[in-house]
């Protein structure tokens, strides 16, 4: 199917390119009209375009003028004019396609065209980058164009407060990483107040390095988790057992799939050592996960490759970028197993609170587009999964880079010796070299060898990535030798002789100028700084060109051809010369796992010495075959992830939509009344499903009713109301009567405490119940998915079984939300203090064990009474009102909700306590899994004085953490 679809997609490319070419000519034809405009006139066009949109004009109609406007603004701010091919790329992005543009063709500048055009709608545009550095850099650099045209620009970064995030999303254009956008979406759907939501919809997004984000990283879901109960002693116990087990005897390892399997012999040994009869008895099944993780930690996770141990802590190293992922942890107890293996302190495990895959997050956008240098090979997957077409954009200048054949050595030692010799030759003649490695370990090994040879070089890996952009920007200078993990520093152009834009920006930064903090001074100083930088690199650029340009040297093939091509693409940008070559050994992971035996056999037959490489078409084909197998395997994994997540995605859409209704308070009273009816009807249906009325257990049914609300009549009274004959009773009669009674009780409660207070109580209660039930459901769905594969042994389709059981569990959860919410709403005690205050008290009026008690916040009991009285006096309209408010303040347990609608319901039981720290797990920049732990401490700094305090006490901020005594 993908093959046929690929051919169909390619047939349409010519038609799209003709359309883009026509638009390009149209933009060029009006360029002079914009050159003659003053800065003020150019800026005024933004308001004109917005008005034309309001008057009914379409975005497509504005495209030529808007693009010409941005082109002229870029010339005046950055000194850069969009090439014709960039105009074509920008149009492709506007129409919701993926623009395939080779490295160095200016994707970042290209994106400014459709970003500006779509930002005119006022709905917000999201620009998605692969890391925080690029998000900040692009927001600053490209932001100069947008700000010149009167647009606001925001950037999202992990350390930002909710208020700062909200402000960034309110901007016309928002830059950030895929993980940050996704996590904000999940957090918004965990928020207890609209004030805590930061995003304002999903209108249009442009994803940079779209193949990396939407394909390579798609199989790793975004997960927000909190601490869960665990027994850490089992990690230690199994860390002792794993070394005693023998590979291929007691267990088997599949390195391709990164899985392990215990054999019968291994099971027998483990049972003997643990003193248990059967490892697979239900009481012992949790131990299987500990065992598997311990073996994985032993066989699949290597120190200094996958992680490092520093200061008694296990820190993950990104497999592809080589960065240390501080605060990130592996899932499913894997990190704890590694900690036990390394004999460091074992940190707590986490429970999933919210979860979504990148595939489903990006499908939320009304319009989606992307940019990359390598997308055509994945065109079918982009079309099937995201409904995105791929448009290959021509290069501005012909590509003349020379890609040399791979050299394969018998041993890794011989390979690295040959690499050092090659680097030494290039360095001696002054040709710059960029060396790509696959791990921190390999980059440090090569660095030591280069030092021994006396070759000066820069190392770019997890231990010095703070300088990576500066190092990469200078990697094209004469004699430069840069050793970098494969993906490090991407997004920064390696220009022969040096990067003048980077040099100019660095100079202004040293002078204390910033495009954000001092925009006017920065713009005034920029032209001169850029001119100086261009003169500095001009002569050196020519010398490097004469030497053959940048030489990219790969020390190992990656599992994806796309990553290899991205590394190669560092050389030969914008028509410059360059060359690339990969050095391999039979010990490389890719060669060892796929087809390495064939190459080994040939080398043995030829009796080649270790330092003699083999260079042949067959080797290239074998490598391509290996990479193809891995790519296909990963594609199947992504498809499988999507199929299973689609089940959860539909459930998530339903629960998030219902949650949003509650959060907004729309028709909340009617929602609660509907819940009451549904729960009571369910009770009646269950009790009257079988037999005649004489057989129904009405006493048991009334007991169930009384656990929900104080029912005011008995079953006997209902029979009397219907002529004293039980046989005339029907389920409808019972339902109708009990509903009316429940509505009357609820209406009385509302009249007692006030409509506004009741709505706030309803909102907080339902949200807390809904969130807890959803968390429990996520846990149960994870547990279901873990074991669903075993259904295949019973000749059942695991996916269909997962869909069926997942649906049943979801329906059960929805019923549970309704029942628990109304039970709480009927039984919570609300005390009304007349005339000024209404509060939710600490007590629960529930008569049954099933009612959920409320616990008053301790902060309220220790409130400074004098401060409360003073605040009450300030807000009183008269002396009498002030005296009344002072009396109220002396005995208050919570903030007024009747006047301000700011009631905050305390946690529904111990388990509802919000965790102090949340953990964020998502795909890393290079396709691995990365985690960070974030303190969920309240955002006090940006809280208005009269808003509820973020600590959750239920009091106003000015009377809680905003009080003078609390301001430190």
From Swiss-Prot:
What is catalysed by this protein? ATP + H2O + cellular proteinSide 1 = ADP + phosphate + cellular proteinSide 2
Q: Where is the composition biased (Basic and acidic residues)?
A: 858-868, 883-898
Q: How does it assemble?
A: Monomer and homodimer. Part of the essential Sec protein translocation apparatus which comprises SecA, SecYEG and auxiliary proteins SecDF. Other proteins may also be involved.
Which HAMAP family does this entry report, sorted A to Z? Answer: SecA
* Protein name in the entry: Protein translocase subunit SecA 1
How the cofactor is bound: the record states: May bind 1 zinc ion per subunit.
Q: Which organism is it from?
A: Thermobifida fusca (strain YX)
Amino-acid positions noted as binding Zn(2+) in the UniProt annotation, renumbered to this chain? 949, 951, 960-961
GO CC term, one of those recorded: cell envelope Sec protein transport complex
- Its job: Part of the Sec protein translocase complex. Interacts with the SecYEG preprotein conducting channel. Has a central role in coupling the hydrolysis of ATP to the transfer of proteins into and across the cell membrane, serving as an ATP-driven molecular motor driving the stepwise translocation of polypeptide chains across the membrane.
């Amino acid at each position: 199917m993908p093959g046929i679809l690929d051919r169909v997609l390619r047939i349409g490319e010519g038609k799209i390119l003709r359309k883009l070419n026509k638009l390009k000519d149209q933009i060029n034809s009006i360029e002079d009209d914009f050159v003659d405009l003053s800065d003020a006139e150019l800026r005024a066009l933004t308001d004109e375009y917005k008005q034309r949109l309001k008057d009914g004009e379409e975005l497509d109609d504005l495209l030529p003028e808007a693009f010409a406007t941005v082109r002229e603004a870029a010339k005046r701010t950055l000194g850069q004019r969009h090439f014709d091919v960039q105009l074509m790329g920008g149009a492709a992005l506007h129409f919701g396609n993926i623009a395939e543009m080779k490295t160095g063709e200016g994707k970042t500048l290209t994106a400014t065209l459709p970003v500006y055009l779509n930002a005119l709608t006022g709905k917000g545009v999201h620009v998605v980058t692969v890391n925080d550095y690029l998000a900040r850099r692009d927001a600053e650099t490209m932001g100069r164009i947008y700000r010149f045209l009167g647009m606001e620009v925001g950037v999202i970064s992990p350390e930002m407060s909710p208020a700062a995030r909200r402000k960034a999303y309110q901007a016309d254009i928002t830059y950030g990483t895929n993980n940050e956008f996704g996590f904000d979406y999940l957090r918004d759907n965990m928020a207890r107040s609209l004030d805590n939501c930061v995003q304002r919809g999903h209108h249009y997004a442009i994803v940079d390095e779209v193949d990396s984000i939407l394909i390579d990283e798609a199989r790793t879901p975004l997960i927000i988790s909190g601490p869960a109960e665990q027994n850490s002693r089992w990690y230690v116990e199994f860390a002792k057992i794993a070394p005693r087990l023998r590979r291929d005897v007691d267990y088997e390892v599949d390195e391709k799939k990164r899985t392990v399997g215990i054999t019968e012999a291994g099971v027998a040994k483990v049972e003997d050592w643990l003193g248990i009869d059967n490892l697979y008895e239900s009481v012992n099944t949790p131990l299987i996960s500990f065992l598997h993780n311990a073996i994985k930690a032993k066989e699949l996770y290597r120190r200094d490759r996958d992680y490092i141990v520093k200061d008694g802590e296990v820190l993950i190293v990104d497999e592809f970028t080589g960065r240390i992922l501080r605060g990130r942890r592996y899932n499913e107890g894997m990190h704890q197993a590694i900690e036990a293996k390394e004999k460091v302190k074992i940190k707590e495990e986490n429970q999933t609170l919210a979860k979504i895959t990148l595939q489903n997050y990006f499908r939320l956008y009304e319009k989606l587009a992307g940019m990359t240098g390598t997308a055509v090979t994945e065109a079918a997957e982009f079309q099937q999964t995201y409904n995105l077409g791929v448009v290959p954009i021509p290069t501005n200048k012909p590509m003349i880079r020379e890609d040399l054949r791979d050299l394969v050595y018998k041993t890794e030692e011989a390979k690295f010796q040959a690499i050092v010799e090659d680097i030494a030759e290039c360095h001696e003649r002054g040709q710059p070299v960029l060396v790509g490695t696959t791990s921190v370990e390999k980059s440090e090994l090569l660095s030591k060898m280069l030092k021994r040879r006396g070759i000066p070089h820069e190392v770019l890996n997890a231990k010095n990535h703070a300088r990576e952009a500066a190092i990469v920007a200078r990697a094209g200078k004469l004699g430069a030798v840069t050793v970098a993990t494969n993906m490090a520093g991407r997004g920064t152009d390696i220009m022969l002789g040096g990067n003048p834009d980077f040099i100019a920006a660095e100079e202004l930064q040293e002078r204390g100028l910033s495009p954000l903090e001092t925009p006017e001074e920065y713009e005034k100083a920029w032209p001169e700084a850029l001119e100086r930088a261009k003169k500095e690199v001009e002569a050196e650029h020519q010398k490097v060109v004469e030497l053959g340009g940048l030489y990219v040297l790969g020390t190992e093939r990656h599992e994806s051809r796309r990553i290899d091509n991205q590394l190669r693409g560092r050389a030969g940008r914008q028509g410059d010369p360059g060359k690339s070559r990969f050095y391999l050994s039979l010990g490389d992971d890719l060669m060892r796992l796929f087809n390495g035996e064939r190459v080994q056999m040939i080398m043995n037959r030829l009796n080649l010495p270790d330092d003699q490489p083999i260079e042949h078409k067959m080797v290239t084909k074998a490598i391509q075959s290996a990479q193809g197998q891995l790519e296909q395997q990963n594609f199947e994994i992504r498809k499988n992830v999507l199929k299973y997540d689609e089940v959860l995605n539909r459930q998530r859409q339903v629960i998030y939509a219902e949650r949003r209704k509650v959060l907004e308070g729309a028709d909340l009273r009617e929602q609660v009344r509907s819940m009451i009816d549904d729960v009571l009807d369910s009770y009646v249906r269950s009790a009257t499903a079988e037999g005649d009325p004489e057989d129904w257990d009405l006493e048991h049914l009334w007991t169930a009713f009384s656990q929900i609300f104080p029912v005011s009549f008995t079953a006997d009274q209902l029979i009397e109301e219907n002529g004293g004959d039980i046989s005339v009773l029907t389920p409808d009669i019972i339902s109708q009567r009990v509903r009316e009674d429940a509505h009357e009780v609820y209406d009385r409660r509302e009249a007692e405490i006030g409509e506004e207070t009741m709505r706030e109580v309803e909102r907080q209660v339902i949200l807390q119940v809904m969130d807890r039930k959803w968390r429990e459901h996520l846990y149960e769905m994870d547990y279901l998915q873990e074991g669903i594969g075993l259904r295949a042994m019973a000749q059942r389709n695991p996916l269909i079984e997962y869909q069926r059981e997942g649906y049943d569990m979801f329906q059960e959860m929805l019923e549970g939300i309704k029942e628990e919410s109304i039970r709480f709403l009927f039984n919570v005690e609300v005390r009304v203090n007349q005339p000024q205050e209404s509060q939710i008290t600490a007590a629960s009026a529930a008569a049954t064990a099933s009612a959920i008690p409320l616990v008053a916040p301790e902060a309220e009991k220790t409130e400074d009474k004098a401060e409360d009285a003073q605040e009450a006096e300030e807000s009183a309209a008269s002396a009498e009102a002030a005296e009344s408010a002072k009396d109220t303040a002396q005995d208050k347990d919570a903030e007024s909700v009747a006047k301000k609608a700011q009631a905050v319901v305390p946690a529904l039981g111990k388990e509802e306590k919000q965790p102090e720290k949340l953990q964020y797990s998502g795909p890393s920049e290079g396709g691995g899994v990365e985690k960070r732990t974030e303190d969920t401490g309240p955002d006090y700094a940006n809280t208005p004085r009269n808003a509820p305090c973020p600590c959750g006490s239920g009091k106003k901020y000015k009377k809680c953490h905003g009080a003078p005594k609390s301001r430190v």
